[in-house]
Amino acid sequence: MLKKIFIIISLYLSLIFSVNANIDIKARTAILQDFLSGEILYEKDPDRSIYPASMTKIMTSIIAFDLIKSGDLSLDDKFIISEKAWRLSTAGYSSMFIMVGDEVSVEDLLLGIIIASGNDACIALAEGIAGTEEEFAILMTSKAKELGMENTNFANSSGINDPDNYSTVRDILIMSNYLIKEHPKYYEWFAEKEFTWNRTGGDPITQGNRNPLLYKNIGADGIKTGYLAVEKYSLASSINRKGRRLIAVGSGFETKSSRSRESSRLLTYGLTN
């Protein structure tokens, strides 16, 4: 019996070693997957609980994309901006800079979320779809459970700091896979490098995509950055080179530069494994 246990433990340890051979990513937690085969090529404490920060916005977008796909929502639908949504644009958070009373299309709100990482746009979209952000968060968590994201709960649509808004890099990976598989047309928006909001009563505002990998020559085409002081820097990313797609998620990078460097290292490593 002891011999069997020893063999099982040895096999498990050898599997972990083979997955993580030859590279150590400087993040608290990370995971890398081959999109087509589903094979995990690297993992580092992938089930550790994290605050997903703006990676939360992937699910916010998914809820809208699902509704568009089912015919219950249109890109041309317009939502009136509430004071709650507007206040986030003046509170120092990443914003689309929408104004109270503006009527903004679903398409513009989604682009403001995906490219400009607008927290104000998240609330506007959430309220437009579900009535309140709290009700929208329930939809997000329900979708997460449907996808098998077992260690995730969403408390808001933007990822601002809340102890009840938590996930893991493994769960973020599951969510990213769903986005790319089920909504390839809209996933292309995540590769856009800038978005111009032609706001009411003011000059147009152009903002760049915050994903640093889009500006490197590695074939990156998404997905979403994140930052919270309690979590440090995070990134869900994907590259598509020579017909092979890889998805990586990391959290707990100490700096912006290390997030960019280590995520790039991880994805490049995956191309040779």
List the predicted regions and their residue ranges.
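Positively charged n-region of N-terminal signal peptides that target proteins for export
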Residues: M1-I5
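General helical structural elements
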Residues: I7-I8, L228
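Bacterial N-terminal signal peptides
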Residues: I8-I16
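Short, intrinsically disordered, charge-balanced linker/junction segments flanking boundaries
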Residues: F17, A21, L271-N273
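Active-site-adjacent loops and short helices of periplasmic peptidoglycan-processing enzymes
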Residues: V19-R170, N177-K181
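Domain-terminus/edge residues, biased toward the C-terminal soluble/receptor-binding domains
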Residues: M149-N153, N161-N273
